[in-house]
């Protein structure tokens, strides 16, 4: 900066300088300082020579022999384990051998492989090193007795994350080795309890008698925490038998001898009695807690709620318990799991609007929905004509949250596409399940349901639900592009094409799949819920011969509990005897049955199907489908056979086990189907006689009587139509389906307008 002055002096230019004080360390270069080493007393040369002479020489052959022995020992341990517990390989978990059962599937476990197949991910699963996890580190004395057997607990390297990995569970072999090496003898109770706590509950439930015997042989008393672990292991699963309840109650008595029951024990007790459907025991436990001034915890409320949702199926009570949890206290406010239970109850009882309101309530209360909620809403919406367009949107929200779809979610995808009649997408999704070794009975039912709901492109008037959004179209396009039906998986008989030409294609493929399932997975076809859509395929797409053939070869009358009255009947020698299992005679294929679409394998298996091992017992749903078929194909004699056999079915144990409310409900449904059957045959007087004979028992309304009223008008029977309308009007008033004029006037007077 320049500055001019009046006396014309030289210009002053200010500058800045940095003054650094002198330092001897900075002025001179650093020198490498050599540290002094401590003096070590030198060893005489004579002593070094002696040391070299004393050092032993290691034989390399001994090292090689030791390594060889170690490898042989490990191989022997694996061979022994495979000999003790042979593997059960089935047709849907390996390509080398086709067995007769599917892999065990746990619905609650996530399946990463399924998600990767859907999203066409090319990433590889992270491999775990073959070492015992820290969570399975045993006490030192137990490790000494186990030796190398503990390596059996490590799962083999696999690219699959499916529940089939539980087959490598070798805890029984490990306990056998421990028992042979001394068992629990001379071990502290703490070490024993630490070891038992390492066993997963699903494995522990089958090993409890063996462990108790080891305790007894060692003379060690079982700690109450170990008894509690036994109880938790036995309480796994959806239901608990009376025999298991007796064992569990015995363990609770042993716990009470050692300590006073705590809140955790009471919570488990109630959960156990809920799964046993024992209301009396639940009330007793609640009474004991009330006497001890123990408040009801959130876990107890959840157990009671689950009893109403899954066991007693009382939706009204479930709503009451849920509302109590909301307004009782801050500690009992519902979380995402509680919301999931009540929303599932809404979907099971077709209360879709209530379920959607609860979802909005969760978002208002900043409660993040979980995958179970969105999956249940998707399935529930698919069953509603009004809300079916929202089904796929709920499923796609799972991907928006970045969650990995569970096996249950994938099953719901199959159900939604099957309910919509999208056979191509359902076949592709089922093919993906075959690739990932995760086929379940629910998935098989959905496949049969898709076949039953198939409509040809010319007769279908609505687009598929998945095609209504851009995400849905891309989803279906990606799935179809990644499936090649020309490459069968495990020999599953999909026809080698992704396009469905006509109904004959559906009949042929479903028959081939049914034959394959009988040979490889017979447990699938023993369920009436599987047989019902299989029969509906023939009802919708086939002829009467197709339907009757499937009815006789896939279902049978379970005569347990039916009185053997027919045994005393006198039968002529030339007269053919009737089948003891069913009044419906098996239709043998002949030259006239040219239109029968049936797999040739089923004809070869007909001899094995006579013992009913590979058939489903007939229930009310099967008889209703049979009546529909009799009405559609106008087979009056067949309808009479169904009515007669349905009367026998009502005497069986299968029907008697139902509650009186459920029995009345099923009888009303059968009577309704019988009226429709007679109407289709133009037998309106017979249909009216069915209504008239049961008018005092069943709530006949316009919903059930409109077809009969319409048929009477079309046939010119005005008197019968008037009688039908009179029954409908009187039942509306009787069953509170219509308000009377006087009651309406009182209602308006109280309301004020």
Curated annotation (Swiss-Prot):
A Pfam family matched in the record: PPR_long
GO biological process: mRNA processing; RNA splicing
Disulfide bond positions: none
PROSITE patterns assigned to the protein according to its UniProt record, in alphabetical order: PPR
Chain segment of the transit peptide: 1-76
Ranges: PPR repeats: 262-296, 297-332, 335-369, 370-405, 406-441
Chief location of this protein within or outside the cell: mitochondrion
Alphabetical UniProt keywords: Mitochondrion, mRNA processing, mRNA splicing, Repeat, Transit peptide
Cellular component terms (Gene Ontology): mitochondrion
Domain of life: Eukaryota
Subcellular location as annotated: Mitochondrion
Family: Belongs to the CCM1 family.
Additional remarks: Involved in mitochondrial-nuclear incompatibility, a major determinant in reproductive isolation between species, through hybrid incompatibility of Ccm1 and its interacting partner 15S rRNA between yeast species.
PANTHER family assigned: OS03G0856100 PROTEIN, OS12G0638900 PROTEIN
Function: Regulates mitochondrial small subunit maturation by controlling 15S rRNA 5'-end processing. Localizes to the 5' precursor of the 15S rRNA in a position that is subsequently occupied by mS47 in the mature yeast mtSSU. Uses structure and sequence-specific RNA recognition, binding to a single-stranded region of the precursor and specifically recognizing bases -6 to -1. The exchange of Ccm1 for mS47 is coupled to the irreversible removal of precursor rRNA that is accompanied by conformational changes of the mitoribosomal proteins uS5m and mS26.
Oligomer status and interactors: Binds to mitochondrial small subunit 15S rRNA.
Protein name: Mitochondrial 15S rRNA processing factor CCM1
Species in which this protein is naturally found: Candida tropicalis (strain ATCC MYA-3404 / T1) (Yeast)
Lineage, opening ranks: Eukaryota, Fungi, Dikarya, Ascomycota, Saccharomycotina
């Amino acid at each position: 900066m320049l500055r001019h002055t009046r006396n014309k002096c030289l210009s002053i230019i200010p500058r800045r300088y940095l003054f650094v004080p002198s330092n001897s360390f900075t002025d001179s270069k650093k020198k490498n300082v050599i540290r002094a080493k401590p003096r070590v007393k030198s060893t005489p040369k004579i002593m070094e020579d002696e040391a070299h002479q004393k050092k032993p020489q290691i034989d390399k052959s001994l090292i090689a022999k030791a390594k060889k022995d170690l490898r042989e020992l490990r191989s022997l341990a694996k061979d022994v384990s495979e000999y003790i517990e042979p593997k059960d390989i089935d047709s849907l978990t390996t390509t080398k051998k086709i067995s007769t059962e599917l892999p065990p599937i746990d619905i609650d476990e996530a399946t990463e492989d399924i998600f990767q197949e859907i999203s066409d991910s090319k990433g590889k699963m992270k491999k775990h090193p073959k070492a015992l996890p820290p969570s399975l580190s045993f006490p030192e004395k137990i490790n000494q007795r186990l030796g190398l057997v503990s390596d059996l607990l490590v799962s083999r390297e696999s690219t699959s994350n499916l529940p089939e990995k539980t087959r490598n569970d070798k805890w029984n072999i490990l306990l056998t080795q421990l028992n042979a090496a001394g068992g629990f003898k001379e071990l502290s109770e703490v070490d024993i309890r630490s070891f038992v706590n390492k066993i997963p509950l699903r494995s522990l439930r089958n090993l409890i008698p063996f462990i108790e015997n080891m305790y007894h042989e060692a003379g060690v008393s079982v700690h109450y925490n170990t008894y509690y672990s036994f109880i938790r292991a036995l309480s796994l699963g959806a239901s608990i038998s009376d025999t298991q309840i007796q064992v569990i109650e015995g363990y609770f008595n042993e716990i009470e001898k050692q300590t006073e029951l705590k809140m955790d024990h009471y919570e488990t007790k109630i959960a156990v009695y809920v799964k046993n459907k024992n209301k009396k025991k639940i009330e007793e436990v609640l009474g004991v807690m009330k006497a001890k001034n123990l408040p009801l915890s959130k876990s107890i409320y959840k157990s009671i709620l689950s009893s109403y949702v899954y066991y007693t199926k009382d939706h009204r009570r479930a709503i009451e318990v849920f509302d109590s949890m909301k307004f009782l206290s801050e500690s009992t406010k519902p979380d995402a799991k509680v919301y999931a239970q009540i929303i599932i109850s809404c979907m099971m009882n077709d209360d879709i609007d209530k379920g959607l309101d609860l979802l909005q309530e969760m978002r208002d209360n900043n409660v993040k929905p979980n995958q179970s909620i969105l999956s249940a809403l998707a399935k529930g919406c698919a069953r509603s004509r009004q809300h079916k367009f929202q089904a796929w949107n709920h499923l796609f929200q799972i991907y928006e949250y970045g969650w990995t779809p569970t096996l249950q979610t994938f099953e719901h995808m199959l159900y939604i596409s099957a309910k919509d009649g999208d056979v191509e997408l359902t076949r592709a999704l089922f093919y993906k399940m075959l690739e990932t070794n995760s086929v379940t009975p629910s998935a098989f039912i959905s496949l049969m349901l898709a076949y039953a709901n198939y409509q040809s492109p010319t007769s279908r008037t609505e687009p598929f639900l998945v095609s209504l959004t851009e995400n849905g179209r891309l989803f279906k396009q990606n799935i179809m592009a990644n499936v090649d039906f020309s490459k069968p998986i495990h020999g599953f008989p999909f026809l080698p094409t992704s396009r469905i030409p006509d109904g004959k294609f559906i009949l042929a493929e479903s028959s081939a799949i049914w034959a394959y399932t009988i040979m490889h997975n017979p447990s699938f076809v023993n369920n009436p819920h599987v047989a019902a859509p299989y029969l509906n395929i023939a009802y919708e797409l086939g002829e009467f011969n197709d339907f009757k053939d499937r009815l006789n070869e896939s279902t049978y009358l379970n005569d347990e509990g039916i009185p053997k009255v027919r045994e005393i009947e006198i039968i002529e020698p030339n007269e053919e005897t009737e089948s003891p299992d069913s009044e419906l005679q098996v239709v043998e294929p002949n030259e006239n049955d040219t239109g029968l679409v049936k797999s040739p394998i089923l004809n070869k298996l007909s001899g094995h199907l006579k013992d009913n091992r590979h058939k489903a017992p007939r229930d009310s749903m099967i008889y209703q489908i049979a009546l529909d078929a009799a009405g559609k194909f106008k087979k009056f004699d067949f309808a009479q056979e169904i009515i007669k056999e349905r009367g026998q079915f009502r005497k069986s144990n299968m029907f008697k086990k139902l509650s009186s409310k459920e029995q009345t409900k099923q009888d009303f449904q059968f009577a309704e189907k019988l009226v429709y059957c007679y109407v289709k045959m133009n037998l309106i007087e017979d249909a009216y006689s069915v209504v008239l004979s049961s008018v005092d028992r069943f709530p006949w309304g316009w919903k059930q009587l409109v077809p009969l009223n319409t048929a009477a008008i079309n046939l010119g029977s005005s008197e019968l139509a008037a009688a039908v309308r009179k029954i409908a009007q009187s039942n509306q008033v009787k069953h509170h389906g219509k308000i009377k004029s006087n009651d309406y006037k009182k209602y308006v007077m109280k309301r004020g307008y």
